[in-house]
């Protein structure tokens, strides 16, 4: 046993780490990629995770050695220092080793890729909301089938890999948020509330098949070749076709909401919004994703800088803290 192994350290969850902290604790490596610096030297680009969140990390020295040791999805005891990089916390890793039988202070429950909130309660509220506001028999049947087929996966799924709601249960939070906004805004413009509710439920459900989280978060074959918009459309058609005499006009309207929700073809929509309901769903989807990005920028700031670095998705820097 080397000196690194003998060091006794208190639990250091990622949420609590600040720039300047020296760390010797267990983390799950969610992603690991070997890259090169501008000078051509190898380094490892990592994403560390625990039940409180994620943090980017780098290994600058002995990258080739560690690239043979480290596997995405596994838990390691990691030594390093948290630093500020462009207004965000990032760990520079100096040592890492695999977890062994003697690591009794490693609680594997801290590294399960599961929602950090009561996702079962939120899932129940989501379907209760739909039940309270849907009156058309075809839509009620459709949502009942959805709940049985896709409810469990919706409860656990990531909303994205990196940009917004990029955590277990993120897709459920995103979906529920849009449903609530539909109820608030659709009546103001005299839009078809029930159509929008069902469109919101289905618009991103393909993400349950676009990503997998075990052993590590990555894109599936279907996700890479088809994308979540096409998968969502396929999942809707599968359920719709099980319902006798489902109105074709209603089916087409829902399909349009799914395929147009990214707004522009260059952003992944097969079609642009051509109905007010489709346009509103696009705007609500965009709004909720952007609000989550603001939230993440502020949560992941190092607590010292007033503004973040330029954020590509937002097209600006984010005010992190008041002076």
Give a label for each model feature.
Residues 27, 73, 178, 285:
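Divalent metal-coordination and catalytic microenvironments
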Residues 138-181, 202-206:
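A short mid-domain helix/strand-loop element embedded in enzyme catalytic domains
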Residues 163-164, 173, 183-300:
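Divalent metal-dependent catalytic cores for phosphoryl transfer on phosphate-bearing substrates
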Residues 45-50, 213:
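Short, acidic/hydrophobic/Gly-rich beta-strand patch recurrent on exposed beta strands
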Residues 282, 304-317, 321-323:
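N-terminal intrinsically disordered, cationic/polar leader segments
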Residues 32-42, 53-109:
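OB-fold single-stranded nucleic acid-binding module
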Residues 1-23:
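OB-fold nucleic-acid-binding modules
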Residues 90-158, 231:
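Extended, charge-rich, solvent-exposed interface segments
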């Amino acid at each position: 046993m080397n000196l690194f192994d003998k060091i006794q350290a208190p639990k250091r969850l990622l949420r609590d780490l600040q720039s300047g902290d020296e760390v010797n604790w267990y983390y799950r490596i969610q992603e690991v990629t070997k890259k090169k610096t501008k000078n051509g030297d190898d380094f490892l680009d990592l994403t560390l995770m625990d039940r409180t969140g994620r943090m980017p990390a780098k290994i600058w020295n002995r990258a080739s050695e560690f690239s043979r040791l480290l596997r995405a999805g596994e838990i390691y005891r990691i030594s390093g220092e948290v630093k500020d990089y462009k207004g965000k916390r990032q760990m520079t890793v100096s040592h890492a080793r695999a977890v062994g039988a003697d690591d009794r202070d490693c609680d594997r429950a801290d590294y399960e890729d599961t929602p950090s909130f009561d996702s079962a309660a939120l899932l129940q509220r989501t379907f209760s909301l739909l039940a309270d506001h849907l009156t058309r028999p075809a839509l009620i049947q459709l949502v009942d089938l959805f709940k049985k087929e896709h409810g469990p996966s919706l409860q656990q799924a990531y909303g994205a890999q990196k940009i917004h709601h990029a955590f277990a249960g993120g897709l459920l939070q995103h979906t529920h948020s849009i449903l609530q906004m539909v109820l608030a805004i659709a009546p103001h413009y005299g839009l078809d509330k029930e159509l929008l509710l069902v469109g919101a439920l289905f618009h991103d459900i393909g993400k349950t098949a676009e990503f997998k989280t075990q052993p590590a978060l990555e894109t599936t074959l279907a996700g890479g070749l088809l994308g979540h918009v096409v998968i969502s459309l396929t999942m809707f058609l599968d359920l719709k076709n099980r319902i006798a005499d489902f109105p074709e006009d209603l089916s087409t309207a829902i399909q349009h909401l799914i395929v147009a929700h990214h707004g522009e073809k260059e952003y992944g929509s097969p079609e642009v919004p051509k109905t007010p309901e489709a346009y509103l769903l696009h705007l609500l989807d965009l709004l909720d994703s952007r609000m989550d990005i603001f939230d993440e920028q502020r949560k992941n700031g190092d607590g010292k800088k007033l503004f973040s670095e330029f954020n590509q998705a937002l097209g600006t820097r984010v005010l992190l803290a008041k002076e």
